[in-house]
Amino acid sequence: MGLEKVLNTIKSLKTTEKVFFISILFSSFVPVYLSFYLIPQTLFSMGVGITTLILIIIYFYYFASDESKWLQRETFMLILVFILIFHLPSLYFGSSRVSHSLPLKDNQIIKGDKFFLGWIFPLGQLSLYLDKNNTVGPHTKLGMIINSFLQIFYSLYYIVPYIFIYILCYANCIRETVYRYNNNGNKSKKYDKHWSELFFILSVYTITYSLVLTINTIIPASSPRLYIQNKYNHQLNLYGISKFFNKICKDNGSANSFPSGHVAETLSIAIALFGMKRYINGTIALIISFLITSATLVLRYHYFCDVLCGILISIFAFIIPYYIAFKKERFEFEKNDNLNINDDDLEKIPYMPALNGEDTEEDD
């Protein structure tokens, strides 16, 4: 693929596609820069660089493909999303390595919690209040049931965003494949709209993930369960599989508390779905995000400021691609849908002979 062909491909991209491409570059090179700046000679950049190169090659190969090879394009898009699923978590492990070597900022974050919620909860921590509660505390049966339920949803964070994204991508591919198979290879009217939605939600999620990890690296913090563990009188007691999930999530070397990726990344998916007018999916994602957010506070994984910053990041990451690209493209798609009138719709329009140049009975 020559340079001229690559440049022509970039020029032909729609705005949502360009935003997605930029978000991929941002997700890779900002953490790499921070790694080199804070800890020289880190090997983290090598893995991210290779992953990014693979992403870019597939990305350009997908868009440079012949339009007639639509099945090839659909297949490569699935591969692109699949690699992205592995690409983003790799950034987490790299940024964690950087954060662990820096002084923690938990004390400053607790001051922020005390400012916002100190008049309600001890040190501004909901988990400390619950620890002393004899009704829903971690030492009560009701508290154990609630905590076990929340632990399951907390663990779902690691798969839920990718499930929503991949199902959306996979559904588009299947829908388009079936349509083209039944229509001599012609693309459907909603083909461009569906892929615009996919690039939009991918951009929102990638930007969110990148911002979270960047701030994680700049402002490292552990978590309430580690930094103020001596303040708690009771351990978290869980039932069944929740105990197993809690053991996996428990990391004594955590330094990525601020901001909360659990909150930011799940909420960004919910907001993006609402922006796409997929209200049912958006509501489901919002409920899951709310439960995950509750789990982060109740189970001592995050401070309130972690949650607050995560919410702000998700909103910011939504605004950028939505107002720069997706809103305008969605308006064009909706306008075209309103202008498209098929034969069945024409038959429903009342017959008005005078407008068709025919004489009416009154004229006779």
Predicted segments — roles?
Residues L3-T51, K69-I163, N182, N186:
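N-terminal transmembrane-helix/juxtamembrane module of multi-pass inner/ER membrane proteins
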Residues E74-L80, Y162-I218, Y227, A285:
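Interfacial segments of alpha-helical transmembrane regions
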Residues L88-G112, T206-Q235:
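Aromatic-rich transmembrane-lumenal/periplasmic boundary elements in polytopic membrane proteins
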Residues I163-A171, V263-N281, A285, L312-P321:
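Membrane-interfacial alpha-helical segments at the cytosolic side of multi-pass membrane proteins
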Residues I215-M276:
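Membrane-interfacial catalytic/cofactor-binding modules of polytopic membrane enzymes
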Residues S223, S257, I292-A317:
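Interfacial helix-loop-helix junctions of multi-pass membrane proteins
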Residues D344-D364:
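Intrinsically disordered, low-complexity cytosolic terminal tails
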